[in-house]
Each structure stands twice: as C-alpha cells, then as structure tokens.
A protein has these predicted regions:
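Short, amphipathic alpha-helical interaction segments positioned at domain boundaries
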Residues: 575, 581-590
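Solvent-exposed segments in extracellular or luminal domains encompassing
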Residues: 567-568
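Structural signature of tandem-repeat unit edges
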Residues: 1-72, 78-131, 135-154, 158-174, ...
Length: 594
C-alpha cells in the first residue's frame, strides 16, 4: 500500500484508502480474514470506488453495503468472488443479487461475481452489460431467458465460461445471445432465431463490437441482426428476402461499415441481385447499397432507374458514372463519400428535390460539371463540399434550390447560364463572385447573408456590370433588391450604406476605396469619419497587414495616429507601433516643408 494514501474505516476490520484528502476516490482496500460484510463509504459526498486494478481477493465477503454517497463502483469479480447480496442506500445502485448501477435512466450490470454451477440464478433484466461483468463466472444457465434484448459491451463475457460453450456456424451462442465468434472461423452464419421465444423477432442480442477475429465472410439470414453490430467482415451475404423493403425504408445505415467490400446474394434470391459487389433490386432497376469499403470507379449499369437514399453514403469509391436510364437519385445518396469525379450521363434531369444533399460533405470533390440534361439541382446537393473549387453549369439548368452550394468555402466564383430561372436561399452564400446573365427573383437571398466567409465583399456580375455588395444587407434593402427580375431593374449605385451593420458598411466602403473602384469624395469622407473606429477594430483583431494598408491610405489624422500609437504600445504590438512612428515622422516632415 502507498503510504501517501489516506485511510478510512467504514466498518469494523474494513479499511478503504483514498488518494485525496476529501475522500472521494478510493484506490485500495484491506479486509481482515473472516469479515463477511464490506461497507463502501467515505464520509463525504460523490465517492468513487476504483478497485478494479487492485490484485487482492476477499473470499469471505458475502455482502456489499453501498452507502448513499457512493456514485461509482469499479471492482473485479475476483476481488469478491463469493458476494451474493448487494444492499444499496445509494440512488445510483440497486439492492439485489448482482451489482447493478442506474445512470440516466439506464440500468447497467457491472458484476455478477464468480457464480458456480448449480447455484441459484436470477435472470438479468438490465439495459446494458458492462465489460467483464461475467468474468470468473462458471455457470452459464439461467441468466438469459431470451425475452429481453441487451446492449453488450465488447468484453462483457471475457474470462467467463460462456466463451467455452460449443460453437455452431462459427458463433458461440445460447438462449438468443451471441457471446463470441469461434477463434478459427473464417465464415460465420447468423441465422434467424425460430424458437418459441424469438419467433416474432428472429433477432439475437450480441456485443455491438463483436470481435470477428479471422472472419472473412458473414451470412445474414435476418437483416435486423445487423442493427446490433458495428463491425463486419469484408463480405456480407444477405439471405433475408425482406431486405429490399427494409432498404427502401431507410434501413441502409445498418450495413455502413467501411470494412465491407462486397455484398453477396443467394443465387435464387427473389428480392435482389449483385453486380460487382453492389446490391440491386432483383429487376436491376434500383441500386440499394454499395459496400462502404469498395474503392475505385463504379460504372452503374444501363437499366438502373433509381439510386437509393444513402446508397453510397461514406463510400470510398473515387468516381462514378451514371447510365442514361437513371431518373432518380434519392437523398444523401453519395453524402460524405470520397468521390472525386462524377459522370452524370444523359438521362437524369434532376439532382434531388427538396431534401436532397446528394453529394453533401464530399470533400474530395474538386471540380463538378453539370450537363445540359439536368434541369434541377436540389436542396443542399453539394452542401459543404469544402474543397470544391470550380463548377461548370451548362445551359439547360433552370432551378438551383436552397443551399445547393452553401458552405463550399473554396468555390470562389460561379457563372450561371442564361437558362437559370431561380436560385434558392443560401445556394451560393459562401461564394465570392457570382456571374449571371440577368437579375431574377431570389438572387440576393441566394448570394448574400453570411458573415462566415474570408473575404470582405460580394461581387455580383450581371451581364458586364459588376456590383460590389456587402456580405449581409439590412433586411429591408435585401427584400427590395431581391424583387428585381431583370438587369435594368437593378440599381446602378454602390451599396455599402445598405449593409446590415457598421462593420460591414466600413468593410465594403474600404474595399471600394482602396481598390479604386469608387474613390469619390463621398466614400472618402465616410471613411475619414470612420477611420479611427476602423483602425482600432483592426488593431484589436490583430489584423496587422490590413491595418498597415489602411494607415497607408492617409485617412487618419495626426491626433488619431498618436492615440493609435498609445493603444498599440499597450498591446505590445511593436511592429504596428514602429510603423505608426514612421507615419508620424512623415507628418512632421510635411509640416516642416510647409
């Protein structure tokens, strides 16, 4: 025992040792031989008993008493192998045969202790079974009746007799519970449970992170068994004939492990077929699911009409080509995938509708070319494709719906064809320059409205006329401009005064002035009036390069420069202080010459 630990005696002949003076974290224990009851307490609130890594054993203890201030207990079954009674005065634990905690309305089995064959057993009725809960347990009967489902941690049965049960079809299972995979299995079959208890569900309980060891192939006779799993082998054969229906009900995320590289089907399947490891409906018209671990190019065969929702979500393919027969791509079909190149074919006319997000979060996309056969780009189709740099939209596209290209931070410039009649709200909100053939309704709501960009103004080009717009308009002016339906209706003026806030007004005016777009007296006078405020803002934001450029414009008075010098020194900004001194010296030289 570490002599630096603090001892506490909760009951006769029991000594708990804490590593803190407040007695909140118990890390060691001693119990005299013959003691059959141990009390967990520390005399303070919020006590944690952390003894799992303490290699001591107290076989005489039959009862554990948990006082009201104990909130956490981590112990090994081997420390108290013969405990058969838990008495709890804490709201975080139950009294009973086993150690069961209650956390956020979830009951967690932590310890059954080392139960021997033939002992009286109580059925497990909890939500979750913790790692090592059955460690050292020799009995395997009576715990599970098959009437409940559980959330098993990966090592729930480690060190128990459950793992010594005989395997069948590569799995070790009993009473509707899969405990482990056979060490030597390369193929496993998870069949459909058909006993009296499970006939309505056909589903096992099993650890979510079931260790597949050397398994290369899994045969699933009931798809719902996959809902409990997060780990799969590289090949999955599905014999569940209801799979087609379940996929169409958006169950496809249950087979979304990137380790899956191929799907297989029964040769006589009535529901689906396999082409190049990808799952299709039996008639080949509906692409249901691509294995997430599939790589390289995918050429979807002619005859396919629909790509299902999330069919390629998170996939590792690099490119795809669509057949001319394709008429529908459902929501999130390619979302979060590693796709780099898309061949749209000549058949499809719409990339989704109102809930699209077909290619959202595809961060390997650099360039996209939208062909003339596509009329509609649906909501969020390319939302948050962070590395998308260029988009070529051909004549023929008519509608670009809400957020279609929103949060594409590297898409700095887009030119729309004259066929475009409508662009939805926020569709180009992250784009710096937008070129259109004519003004039309919705233009301002689509293009402006975000502060979260790394440039100062928006550039709207209508025909050959460039307008420099604030990032965000005041609502009234945005509404009025948004109603312009042709180029002649769009006001021929500067818009810095229409910005939503003072900072954006200043940024827009400054951009116009320093780039010689508008260096009129009106803009210059406005910037002079605002010069001190602008300078202090840039100083506070540590935007030294911008501040230097602003000082070079000569808009700050000598008095303002002196005040700015004091502020820069207070902030220990030596480079700005030095530059201001140089500018003040120019003032002195100019005065002397006069």
């Amino acid at each position: 025992m570490n002599n630096n630990l603090i001892s506490f005696n909760p009951c006769q002949d029991v000594f708990l040792y804490f590593d803190d003076s407040s007695l909140k974290n118990c890390v060691d224990i001693d119990i005299k031989e013959g003691v059959d009851t141990v009390v967990f307490d520390g005399g303070n609130s919020q006590i944690s008993i952390n003894l799992r890594n303490v290699n001591k054993q107290f076989p005489d203890v039959k009862t554990i008493v948990i006082n009201e201030d104990v909130i956490e207990i981590n112990i090994s079954n081997f420390m108290f192998p013969n405990v058969r009674n838990v008495v709890s005065h804490s709201q975080y634990f139950y009294s009973g045969r086993y150690l069961i905690s209650s956390v956020y309305f979830s009951d967690i089995l932590k310890n059954v202790f080392c139960i021997k064959p033939g002992e009286n057993i109580e059925e497990i009725t909890v939500d979750t079974i913790e790692d090592y809960a059955f460690e050292g347990c020799i009995e395997t009967d009576g715990f599970f009746s098959g009437t409940m489902s559980y959330d098993f941690k990966e090592k729930a049965f480690a060190g128990s007799a459950f793992l010594n049960l005989p395997s069948r079809n590569g799995i070790i299972a009993k009473n509707g519970v899969i405990f482990a995979v056979d060490d030597d299995a390369t193929e496993i079959i998870i069949d459909e449970l058909k006993d009296a208890v499970h006939k309505w569900t056909g589903v096992y309980s099993m650890p979510m992170d079931l260790d597949l060891k050397h398994v290369k192939k899994m045969i699933l006779h009931h798809l719902d068994n996959a809902e409990s799993m997060t780990v799969f082998p590289e090949t999955v054969m599905i014999t569940d004939e209801s799979y087609d229906t379940k996929i169409r009900r958006n169950y496809c995320n249950i087979l979304n492990d990137k380790r899956i590289k191929n799907f297989e089907a029964k040769p006589d399947s009535q529901s689906f077929t396999i082409i190049d490891g990808i799952l299709y409906s039996k008639d080949g018209k509906y692409l249901l699911k691509c294995p997430r671990g599939k790589t390289g190019h995918v050429s979807i065969p002619e005859g396919v009409k629909t790509i299902g929702a999330e069919a390629f979500r998170g996939c590792m393919i690099s490119s795809v080509s669509f057949p001319d027969s394709l008429t529908e791509i459902q929501s999130n079909a390619f979302s979060c995938s590693l796709i780099q190149k898309i061949g749209f074919g000549h058949g499809i006319t719409s990339l989704g509708y109102y809930e699209s997000h077909i290619f959202s979060h595809c961060n390997d996309l650099i360039h996209v070319e939208i062909p003339s056969n596509i009329e509609t780009i649906g909501n969020g189709t390319f939302f948050s494709c962070k590395n998308l740099e260029s988009v070529k939209i051909h004549e023929g596209v008519k509608w670009i719906r809400d957020s279609a290209f929103a949060e594409c931070d590297n898409l700095r410039s887009v030119e729309l064809p004259s066929s475009v009649e409508y662009i939805g709200e926020n569709s180009f909100i992250s784009t710096e320059t937008l070129k259109v053939d004519s003004a039309f309704g919705g233009l301002l709501y689509a293009f402006t409205g975000s502060y979260a960009v790394n440039f100062d103004v928006k550039k709207l080009i209508i025909k050959d006329k460039t307008y420099y717009l604030p990032l965000v308009f005041n609502p009234k002016q945005q509404y009025l401009l948004n109603r312009c339906n042709k180029a002649s209706e769009f006001p021929d003026r500067q818009f810095y005064k229409d910005a939503a806030c003072t900072e954006l007004k200043q940024n827009t005016a400054l951009y116009l002035y320093e780039n010689h777009i508008d260096d009129s007296d009106e803009v210059k006078k406005y910037l002079k009036r605002s010069s001190k405020q602008i300078a202090y803002r840039l100083l506070d934001l540590n935007k030294d390069d911008k501040l230097v450029k602003f000082i070079q414009l000569g808009l700050l008075s000598k008095a303002s420069l002196n005040e700015l010098l004091l502020s820069s020194r207070e902030k220990n900004n030596a480079s700005i202080s030095s530059y201001i001194l140089e500018e003040l010296d120019k003032f002195s030289q100019s005065t002397f010459r006069l």
